[in-house]
Amino acid sequence: DSEFVELKIRGKIFKLPILKASIGEDVIDISRVSSEADCFTYDPGFMSTASCRSTITYIDGDKGILRYRGYDIKDLADKSDFLEVAYLLIYGELPSSEQYNNFTKKVAVHSLVNERLHYLFQTFCSSSHPMAIMLAAVGSLSAFYPDLLNFKEADYELTAIRMIAKIPTMAAMSYKYSIGQPFIYPDNSLDFTENFLHMMFATPCMKYEVNPVIKNALNKIFILHADHEQNASTSTVRIAGSSGANPFACISTGIASLWGPAHGGANEAVINMLKEIGSSENIPKYIAKAKDKDDPFRLMGFGHRVYKNYDPRAAVLKETCNEVLKELGQLENNPLLQIAIELEAIALKDEYFIERKLYPNVDFYSGIIYKAMGIPSQMFTVLFAIARTVGWMAQWKEMHEDPEQKISRPR
């Protein structure tokens, strides 16, 4: 039997159905409140509001659980590669060997971008932030694929593959342009992660040999960042998509949202914070500053809007960070890592942080890994966008296949 909750407004009782979740919390359906009760709900930041039905990602923040299509994130990070996870998010199941091979071949074929896009990059000054370039470049793809301007006629699968394939190419192009080096074309003989590293670090006069430890670490980072329920950027993509905007425009809005320091820019902020702390001796002083509500200093990389336990992605990245720095000979002499390890140890024992359930999040160690790889801090959010494009496209595809989908219109 259906369950209801009763809402009493001005003496009149309204019965609101409770929708059963397949896993996690149930949901109260308030969709009729506005029309029948002559009022609507107020929920700043949508802290208690589900905007859609989704079967893509599940999070239990109290228990520190993250699953893609029912698969635990740690299992996927340990046993899968990024395009295998991309297939899982888009299609709902892990691919067979044949499906995986066909999917990866399609992604490789579509990794090349139109030559005329090169001229767009030349319009930016060399000091432009790579995310600013990415915003323009991704949006400009609409001009190269006019057939997708009518989303109802779009091939959702081909659109997703094109986007996943071209974002890393444009990301590497934005980096190369910022440092004055020539663009490097994709190499279809390399896998997804190897190809990106090749486009980032190879030059016409020198081949880049991909370190397998670096490749494995970046593969894990991409998997961990691929999707995360209805966060700010994903919700932005869905809202833009609900109006019928073309997919390239939708993804560019996601990139804009991701650029914010409270969202995708947090790992860059962690690096800046660790540099500001400077040495382990200064940690107690900065812990005190973080506790002082009148002090503008904030401890970046701790706490999460959803997780009230240790972020499962952070646990994977802490281990990965040690592997990368050991491989590069930086495990004992990386000052940022030493500060991060001691800062985490002190914070996890401090009652202030324990009471507020402020644990390290995914951004705490990812920036250290990137920096050790030779990736500059202004590129951190760009790499986040490469990974999250998979989630955005899975969510965009799911939204357009949802019979309940309507144009978003918050009150």
Swiss-Prot record:
Presence of keyword Transferase: yes
E.C. designation(s): 2.3.3.16
Record-annotated membrane-spanning stretches: none
Note: Citrate synthase is found in nearly all cells capable of oxidative metabolism.
GO molecular function (one): citrate (Si)-synthase activity
Keywords: Transferase, Tricarboxylic acid cycle
Pfam family, one: Citrate_synt
Organism, scientific name: Rickettsia canadensis
Superkingdom: Bacteria
Upper lineage: Bacteria, Pseudomonadati, Pseudomonadota, Alphaproteobacteria, Rickettsiales
SUPFAM superfamilies assigned to the protein according to its UniProt record, in alphabetical order: Citrate synthase
Catalytic activity: oxaloacetate + acetyl-CoA + H2O = citrate + CoA + H(+)
Active site: 304, 363
Sequence similarity: Belongs to the citrate synthase family.
This protein's pathway: Carbohydrate metabolism; tricarboxylic acid cycle; isocitrate from oxaloacetate: step 1/2
Alphabetical GO biological process terms: tricarboxylic acid cycle
GO terms under cellular component: cytoplasm
Record-given protein name: Citrate synthase
Record keyword Lipid biosynthesis present: no
Family annotation (CDD domains): EcCS_like
